[in-house]
């Protein structure tokens, strides 16, 4: 089921920055926010508990990737935080993903990172020794995530239709690399607008800089939300 709220990537260096950012929004507006590695490692679980206490939904993007037993143990802890969605790396393999899903259960949605939106085919060839296209690699990882029982994957909107065809219509596609029309693409190479992501079948979109660096974050958020739901 498609999430109507864009997920806001809280890519801030400090707790105070997040508090300042949230002041742009009324208290009764419940957001869906992403906490990434930098912020979580700097602040710890306290940030999750704080945001959940305010009634916001949490996408914890830690991209766990280790041996199956270690990821299982880590996920058993994360599952107690009240998060709504969390990530592992599909490259960790079917057993690792399956163990993570078993211990997490229905406490939160578990999605796998396929190829990062900053990854080019040259990067895949030179650094990962993968001699296929980005799309072929992403679809293969998506199939493995589905096999492991995960709820979906993180992928570029450009791969959504292929992934749905290779897995299932209800297999979730979480799409970063979303930029409003005319904005800077930054360091992400595979990007789309909110409208394009909607039309192509994305279930969630993740937006960072166009909202958190906007002069008026509330206006920017609602404009992107409007585009996403149009």
From Swiss-Prot:
Q: Which Pfam families match?
A: OMPdecase
Give the Gene Ontology MF terms in alphabetical order: orotidine-5'-phosphate decarboxylase activity
Organism lineage: Bacteria, Bacillati, Bacillota, Bacilli, Lactobacillales
State the species of origin: Streptococcus sanguinis (strain SK36)
Functional pathway: Pyrimidine metabolism; UMP biosynthesis via de novo pathway; UMP from orotate: step 2/2
Location of the active site: 63 (proton donor)
Q: Which reaction does it catalyse?
A: orotidine 5'-phosphate + H(+) = UMP + CO2
SMART domains, per this entry?
Answer: OMPdecase
Q: Which UniProt keywords apply?
A: Decarboxylase, Lyase, Pyrimidine biosynthesis
Q: E.C. number, please?
A: 4.1.1.23
So which residues are the signal peptide here? Answer: none
GO biological process, alphabetically ordered: 'de novo' pyrimidine nucleobase biosynthetic process; 'de novo' UMP biosynthetic process
The entry assigns this protein to a family as follows: Belongs to the OMP decarboxylase family. Type 1 subfamily.
Per the entry, what this protein does is: Catalyzes the decarboxylation of orotidine 5'-monophosphate (OMP) to uridine 5'-monophosphate (UMP).
Give binding positions for substrate. Answer: 11, 34, 61-70, 117, 179, 188, 208-209
**What is the protein name given in its UniProt record?**
Orotidine 5'-phosphate decarboxylase
Question: Is Mitochondrion found in the keyword set?
Answer: no
Q: Which SUPFAM superfamilies match?
A: Ribulose-phoshate binding barrel
Q: Which PROSITE patterns match?
A: OMPDECASE (PS00156)
The Gene Ontology CC terms held by the record are: cytosol
Assembly and interaction partners: Homodimer.
